[in-house]
Amino acid sequence: MKIGSIGYNHVHDMKYENFIMDRPKGPGAVLLLLIKTPSVFRVGGVQYQVKENSFILMSADTPCYYTAQEDVYTDDWVYFENGYWDKEYVEKLGIPMDIPVYLGDIDELSHLVHILVYEHYSGAVNSEEIEKKYIDVLFLMPVSY
């Protein structure tokens, strides 16, 4: 699997912006979100009240909508390149697609995303290989919760 773009600890304060992510045709690529604040999600026509410290792995073409449930929406996000997405690997691990999952504690996962942000944008020697290893860890961690 390969990262297309990635972001760490993005905060949207609803006092200053009306943050709504509305993608009726889906996000365009597989999207992993680590959700850090209570949120409202509608994925594939099903609405969810999502607790903080949850994650969701959304399919590229599943319609989705999400926003803050309160004053702030915060998440880490990872878009995966479509040509490199390994659906069989994720299915083998038993990670659900298009359904929010409450983990209780996402600090380690969020820290890993922070490291991945650096690796992805650094262009350092071997960063692509290092990134691949961290992606494996990223998908193995939720399975261990």
Please describe what each predicted stretch is.
Residues 132-140:
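Hydrophobic alpha-helical segments that form the core
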Residues 1-15, 55-125, 139-144:
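A hydrophobic/aromatic-rich effector-binding and dimerization subdomain
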Residues 1-51, 70:
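Generic protein-terminus/edge-of-domain signal
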Residues 125-133:
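Short, solvent-exposed positions on alpha-helices
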